[in-house]
Amino acid sequence: MKAKGRILLLTSCLFLLLLLLAKIHLRNHQEEELPLSDWFDPRRRLDVITTTDWLAPVIWEGTFDRKVLEKYYHKQNITMGLTVFAVSSFNGQYLDPFLQSASKFFMPGYRVIFYIMVDKSLKLPEMGHNPLQSFQVLVVSQERQWSDFDLMRMTVLSKHIREHIRFEVDFLFVMSVNMVFQNVFGVETLSTSVAQLHAWWYFRKTTHLPYERRPTSAAYIPFGLGDFYYAGAIIGGVPFQVLDFTHQYLKSVILDIENGVNSTYEKYLNKYFFLNKPTKLLSPEYSWDQTFNIPQQVHYVKVAHYPTDDL
């Protein structure tokens, strides 16, 4: 564990250097963002929460003007990234519908790089040619220590963001493979740090949210605190912001291991966003669990989230 601690310290120092170099980029990016009032009107959806206490927009159908956003972002000449992990049996059963639907509905009209993380060689499904889309199939080494899928996912993701993704895209989303796009997932979702509201817990009282309540865990959030419960199926933002999350997640996991406790990926995610407020929240429309009845607040399901045995 001492060796792990030294490695973690060295990694942290290198990562902090990267973050310092990224500060100017992030500051400039935020200054160039289109003013919220130009494209976002929270008054059009009085039936739901549309603005957080820290004034971040919550994106629901009807609150945004995509035409205004399209006009702005097309001038920026931006590239989007979408990362998905498809290992073991997920390769064919879940990846095909994910990619087929994403190629149609994810950021249409923009350059998109799909980063597909697999544990063996993969033949992509046949899809219509789109000159704006490219695919990178990245093989994850099969190592025995990857007993924890999320630990593997964040370790590999962090490595690829540092080595090349941060140079290739302006915005990056990471999504679960057991999802199918049903409507446009467009530029209304872009921001420095993007969090996805949990489809089930959004409609529950905050006192019942399943945060980590053990003080010994790095994911701990005390009773009476917390904003929303965020889903682990989608996270996004500028590459350095996603990289920051992977770093904090890995740091928290190692700390918990050293203290003899463990928590879940989603609870670490919620602790991160509790301390580092997202600049944009996606409504449950962007990751709707198909096992739930659709409430009247959900006008259009953008992405359907399926249990892993339903596809």
Swiss-Prot record:
Its main location: membrane. The chain crosses the membrane at residues 6-26. GO terms for molecular function: glycosyltransferase activity; hexosyltransferase activity. The keyword Glycosyltransferase applies. Its EC number is 2.4.1.-. Glycans are attached at residue 77. It is found in: Membrane. One of its GO terms (cellular component) is membrane. Its cofactor is Mn(2+). Residues 27-311 are lumenal. It is an enzyme of class 2 (transferase). Keywords: Glycoprotein, Glycosyltransferase, Membrane, Signal-anchor, Transferase, Transmembrane, Transmembrane helix. The active site is at 266 (nucleophile). Substrate binds at residues 85-90, 176-178, 198-201. Pfam families: Glyco_transf_6. It is a single-pass type II membrane protein. GO terms for biological process: carbohydrate metabolic process; lipid glycosylation. Residues 1-5 are cytoplasmic. Binds 1 Mn(2+) ion per subunit. Belongs to the glycosyltransferase 6 family. This is Glycosyltransferase 6 domain-containing protein 1. The lineage of its organism: Eukaryota, Metazoa, Chordata, Craniata, Vertebrata. The gene is Glt6d1.
